[in-house]
Amino acid sequence: RQMCIRDSVYLVARMFPLFIGYAPEVLHWTAYVGAFTAFYAAVVACVQSDIKRVLAFSTISQIGFMLVALGVSTSADPHAGGLGYMASMFHLFTHAMFKALLFLGAGCIIHAVHSNEMSAMGGLRRYMPLTHLTFLVACLAIAGIWPLSGFFSKDEILTACFAFSPVMGWVMTAIAGLTAFYMFRLYYGIFWGAENRELHAAHKPHEAPLTMTLPLGFLACLL
């Protein structure tokens, strides 16, 4: 399903020479639709309690970022236009890494508490230190915090957006702020929120086995 979503970015990128040469208005609409998609999905992610739903809507929002970057490649500034295309492809790769880490981390968490709901979590940093650390790295990356890869790909996207239109630049900056909000809401709720002692007494949370945590460490090092 995740690959099918990313296919839209790949298709626009493959057709980019045709769009830029013969139908640049298509790229304009791609940018506008991408911005709306990024905003709508980010707002929905802010109110989800199922951790997999948060990550799913986050993926939709980040795909919107990539489409916006492709759409603003029609900027009058040739450098900024080329930057938009490159930033989109760069963000496609960085997003693949930190979102893979987030979903694998979510799998470890669900394995530990047998629930997708944040209400069944809270205080897991004491029981799952490695998952906690790697999940934090992924949250920092997707939020665009320096010096992780997400900072550089989002910075390039925002630079291209401001060159295209100051309004588009500020809109995407605000959406980047929303991304940081819902990801740290998720992180805090899982690892620092109020612990559900009744559920944890019935089934004590535990760190995932090495076969599950080793990929987390590997992906965290790539970010």
PLM regions with names:
Residues 2, 6-222:
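Hydrophobic transmembrane alpha-helices and their helix-loop junctions in integral membrane proteins
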